[in-house]
Each structure stands twice: as C-alpha cells, then as structure tokens.
Amino acid sequence: MFHKGLNKEVLIEASKELVEENGIAAFSMRALAEKLGVKTASLYAHVASMDTLFTEVGLSALHDQKVAQLAAIEGKDGDAAVFALAESYRTFAKAHAALYQLIMQMPMGKDETLRAAAAMTAEPSMQVLQGYSIGEERRMHWQRVLRGVMHGFVSQEASGYFSHYPVDLEESYRLAIQCVIDGLHKEAAQNER
C-alpha cells in the first residue's frame, strides 16, 4: 500500500534531515516513519532496506557536495579555484557534519553505483587542477592529495584535535591548501622546462 505523496525522493530528503538532526547512530526506519507520519512497513514499498536507503542518502549528499563545490569554483581558475574548492569542501563538512560522516563511511569500492559516485566527486577537483600544466594521470594523483588534505583537516577539526593550540584554524587550513598549491606549481614548472 502506498501512502499518498510518499516516494523514494521524499524518503531520502526526510532521512537526510533526520541524520543531520540526530546523527547516523540515532537513525532508524521507525524514526523516519514517525517523521513522515506513516507506518514503518510502508517505507519498504520504496526502499529495500535501511542499508539501501543509507546508500541513497549518501549519494544525494555527495551530489549536494559536488553542486556546492562546482558553484564555489565557477568563474575561477588556478590558485583561486583551489582555495574556493577547499573552502567549499570544509564548509560543507562543517555545515553537514553527520551527512559528511555518512559519505565517508560509504564503501565506495564494493558497488558500481558507489564507485561511479566516487568518480563524480572527483570532478570539481579535476576541474580546478586543469589550470596547472600537469598531465591527466598526475591530475588524478593530485586530486587524491588535495582531497586527502581537505578530508584530513576537516576530520581532525571535527574531532577536536586542533583545539589544543591557540593558533588561527583558518590560517592553518589556508597553509595546508597552500602546500598543495606549491606542490602543483613546482610540478607544473618542471613540466614546462
């Protein structure tokens, strides 16, 4: 039996809201049903399981993150684009901490849909790296480095690891991204010789 107005997209959006409000650990199909004012069993007409729903929620969050990053880098290139991407990445991770955590827990290598999504998330990074004189394969390496630096920083920041020192966090993040940019310039200069 289908509840009027209930569909997979409604479930995904309501699930994202619940995850953001209460965290991943507190999420349940029962809580989702209560939020939507339906019986828990009616949810399974739209999704096979909670794992399937979490995959869909993660994919939606990945899409949201990608859209935010592409908007941030629009009209920018070179170093300005890298800094804009990095700021967008960090802003998303802080504003949507539980969804970001869900994204990072998705087993990207085990499912073709998830692997395609992982490739999709590399798109903004690959786009900003086109502004440097490095080959396609090296760009793949550099986007991993850039994403690794951004993720490492926001993960440690979220865990409170940076709260022990009275130095400006913004400057620390800027410095981390500048190190990546310096490496890009060094490699690009070597390629231009």
Residue ranges and their predicted role:
Residues 8-13, 20, 25-26, 37, ...:
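An amphipathic alpha-helix adjacent to DNA-recognition modules
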Residues 19, 53-61, 103, 107, ...:
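Alpha-helical DNA-contacting segments of helix-turn-helix folds
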Residues 92-112, 155-163:
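Amphipathic alpha-helical segments used for helix-helix packing
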